[in-house]
Amino acid sequence: MAKIIGIDLGTTNSCVAVMEGSTPKVIENAEGARTTPSIVAFTEDGERLVGQPAKRQSVTNPERTFFAVKRLIGRRYDDPTVEKDKHLVPYSIVRADNGDAWVEADGKKYSPSQISAFVLQKMKETAESFLGEKVEKAVITVPAYFNDAQRQATKDAGRIAGLEVLRIINEPTAAALAYGLDKKSAGTIAVYDLGGGTFDVSVLEIGDGVFEVKSTNGDTFLGGEDFDMRLVTYLADEFKKEQGIDLRNDKLALQRLKEAAEKAKIELSSATQTEINLPFITADATGPKHLTLKLTRAKFEALVDDLIQRTVEPCRLALKDAGLTAGQIDEVVLVGGMTRMPKVQEVVKQFFGKEPHKGVNPDEVVAIGAAVQAGVLQGDVKDVLLLDVTPLSLGIETLGGVFTRLIDRNTTIPTKKSQTFSTAEDGQTAVTIRVFQGEREMAADNKMLGQFDLMGIPPAPRGVPQVEVTFDIDANGIVQVSAKDKGTGKEQQIRIQASGGLNDADIEKMVKDAEAHAAEDKKRRALVEAKNHAEALVHSTEKAVAEHGDKVGAVEKGAIEAALADLKSTLEGDDVEAITAKTNTLAQASLKLGEAMYAAQQPGAEGAAKPADDVVDAEFTEVDDDKKKSA
């Protein structure tokens, strides 16, 4: 049975793990790293780079390098949070035909699901290379506070990458699974997850293999990227004060600032001061300009203090929803790279009144939890039951634009709930069901997930027809809504397709694009391998001709030199078959030279050392020490 893998699709980094028997294992990628940057880039000639290779060239190719795209997934272009990000990233965020936020490079638009799919493909290949078999099924994690549109978009990304997503699991829940798998004692834990782009806090009760989420809260636009951007803004402001040049208008400089900010942030977790040194960051009429600045940990903490404080309110709400006090939490588990920051740990300690647990790897624990859930689905992991919750209330718009809740936040999923509504006007023959997700009292202030019409209601006075609306949330947190006229039995149901989002045709096209890209990547790899093999042969043959060319006849030497010249000129092109054919020709032609070189090394060959006259051929037998003594 093919393995089901667990993938942590992160804002900054992604990670893949698999169960080996009853033990989860994080898989190293082709570069030998256990996490892969969630970065996708396109080179000038259209080659696609994913992970570390994409990150390495980001400074010289900022407009075609996409990072932190998870923050855009399932979001509308006119979302205020997208508006804020547009001016802080060097790549273009554009409006898609359906009103969603997409990204663009060289005139080609990509949906965030598509970019995420390229990262997922890399994780899939990493797992396949380790397992030695095809991988087609996965469990993928999402921030607990993701809404339906964001969950659906993540599932779409999996489909585009050629993966059947068996389960979407919340990141803090996955972390709790990994943390609690080998724990024997029962208890209540809080998972504080501050990652690259999102913040979640979940309260869980663990005991006897049951992981029950009591509540969850968070902010899907708060994470390490915001800390980086705060530092980028500070550096740009300081440079402008000193030099009068705004580096934010220069995409190349902006990318260098971003890289320096990330590096400084990481260094300040262990050091109390760091130096940011960016020579030749820009130039004006007076010549090149350099940015040099000392940054203390205290200054950095002051710059981002409000961001850290923003995590406190979700923690308070999560405890309130769970009906618990901070003192009733047995353990606080830190997840996400940003929890390495001493100030973050200090704030967590102050709020919960206890030292946070640092025994899990914050970068890998979510992928490990996803692998455990994959093991549960596969039947490899027994006696584990996961009870998650829906993060946001779900309901419909009723008369006067009021948001009427059908399912409250933190309801255990899967769940199903029905409620009966009626018409607002006399003789009304159709109703429009508008579905929303959120916590505000007016529907317009919440996130609209979609709408559909129930037609063919028999005309009747207002308030008489009875329309039963049913919400069904599956274990992935994805919503299905149906409406039924009780009088006629007519029913209309939809799996929520956000007013934006990708339809099946879009996804199918993107799947084909991804397959085409995979085919192109294979061709490129074949070309690189053919060229490497050819160049190695050219080098070794030239060396052999220089050292041993006199050992073959003029005809053979001429044939080798002709084949060499032929292969060298073919190497200037990109025809794999031609390069392979010419490589074989050269290999064949240089066989005679190899034979001559080998013959020259043999005893009796010309130039080989002759044995001395007094050397006698003899047979040797082993004699043990006792016989030696008696001899």
UniProtKB/Swiss-Prot annotation:
It comes from the Bacteria. The modification Phosphothreonine is found at residue 198. Gene3D superfamilies: 1.20.1270.10, 3.30.420.40, Actin, Chain A, domain 4, Substrate Binding Domain Of DNAk, Chain A, domain 1. Pfam families: HSP70. The keyword Nucleotide-binding applies. InterPro entries: ATPase_NBD, Chaperone_DnaK, Heat_shock_70_CS, HSP70_C_sf, HSP70_peptide-bd_sf, Hsp_70_fam. CDD domains: ASKHA_NBD_HSP70_HSPA9. Keywords: ATP-binding, Chaperone, Nucleotide-binding, Phosphoprotein, Stress response. One of its GO terms (molecular function) is unfolded protein binding. SUPFAM superfamilies: Actin-like ATPase domain, Heat shock protein 70kD (HSP70), C-terminal subdomain, Heat shock protein 70kD (HSP70), peptide-binding domain. Induction: By stress conditions e.g. heat shock. Residues 601-631 are annotated as: Disordered. The keyword Lyase does not apply. Residues 614-624 have a biased composition (Acidic residues). Belongs to the heat shock protein 70 family. Acts as a chaperone. This is Chaperone protein DnaK. It comes from Xanthobacter autotrophicus (strain ATCC BAA-1158 / Py2).
